[in-house]
Amino acid sequence: IIFQNRSGNENVIEIADNSFSKSSIEEAILTEGFKYIGLNAFSDCKKLHQVVLPVSVEEIENSAFENCNSLKSISLPMLLKTIGDAAFKGTGLRTLDIPKSVFWIGDDLLAECQSLEHIKIPDNIARITDRMFMNCSGLKKVELHEKLNAIGERAFFGCSSLDFIIIPDSVQQIGQDAFTGTDDMFIVQCSFGSFAEQYCRKNKIKYQLV
C-alpha cells in the first residue's frame, strides 16, 4: 500500500493509532509529508516485509511495528526525533541504524528480536533503556560509545549469543539483571576502577580489565 499525503496541509500528518494493526498488509510505502506513526499503527502485521518512511517522519510511537516478524530491515529517516516503547519489539530486524537526530528512545525497543545480530549505539543516545534488547537470542555484537552513561534493567537479559561487551568509563549506572541469561562465556571488558568493574564484582560477572 502506498500512503500519499495529498491534503497540502503542512500541519502534522499521521498514520493514526491502530490504523493497520493485525492486518494482512505486506508493504507500507509512505510519501513525503507524514510526520507521525501512531501507537500500534502496524503492530502484529505478520506479513509486513517492507516499510519505506519519508524524511519527514519525526516520531514513531509505542509498539508501532511490534510483532511484525517478517520485517527484516528498515531505514529510519534522518529527521526522526523519538522512537516509542517497543516500537520494533518482536520484529525480524537483523540490525537497526538509529539516526543522530534521535534524542529519545523508549523501553523494550528491540526486545524479542531473535534475528538481531549487531547493534551500534550512536553517541546521541545517552542511555540504553530498560529491556532494550531483552531476549534477542541472536545478538552477537554490541558497540557502545564513550558518552554512554547508563544501561537499563534487563537491557541484555536473555541475549544468549552475546559473549562479550566493552563498557566505557562514562557508564555510571547499570540496572538489575542487565546481563542475566547471556552466553555462558560472557565477559565484560572495562577499565580498572570503573563503575562497570564494581558492578561486575558485586554481581559476580566475569570481567577483563583493558
Residue ranges, per PLM feature:
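Short, structured coil segments at secondary-structure junctions
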Residues: 202-204
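Consensus positions within tandem repeat domains that build extended binding/scaffold surfaces
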Residues: 16-19, 38-41, 61-64, 84-87, ...
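Structural signature of tandem-repeat unit edges
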Residues: 1-14, 23-36, 46-59, 69-82, ...
